[in-house]
């Protein structure tokens, strides 16, 4: 079953994106380089609760 997760910017800690993931196949936390509109730059976004 896919669950909804939130991605937070590693620089400003704001939660900018949501996505879904299958916790059975990917138990580790997700990490993407995405654009943060508050930092005005591409930063690493990590999975949060």
UniProtKB/Swiss-Prot annotation:
Family stated for the protein in its record: Belongs to the bacterial ribosomal protein bL33 family.
Any Gene Ontology CC annotation: ribonucleoprotein complex
Name of the protein in its database record: Large ribosomal subunit protein bL33
SUPFAM superfamilies given in the database record: Zn-binding ribosomal proteins
HAMAP family, alphabetized: Ribosomal_bL33
The gene coding this protein: rpmG
A Pfam family that the UniProt record links to this protein: Ribosomal_L33
Alphabetical keyword list: Ribonucleoprotein, Ribosomal protein
One example GO MF annotation: structural constituent of ribosome
NCBIfam families for the chain: PRK00504.1, PRK00595.1, rpmG_bact
Organism listed in the record: Syntrophobacter fumaroxidans (strain DSM 10017 / MPOB)
S-S bonds: none
UniProt keyword Ribosomal protein present: yes
Any one GO BP annotation for this protein: translation
């Amino acid at each position: 079953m896919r669950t909804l997760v939130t991605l937070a910017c590693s620089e400003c800690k704001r939660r900018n994106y949501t996505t879904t993931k299958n916790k059975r196949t990917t138990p580790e936390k997700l990490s993407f380089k995405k654009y943060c509109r508050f930092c005005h730059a591409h930063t690493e976004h990590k999975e949060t609760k």
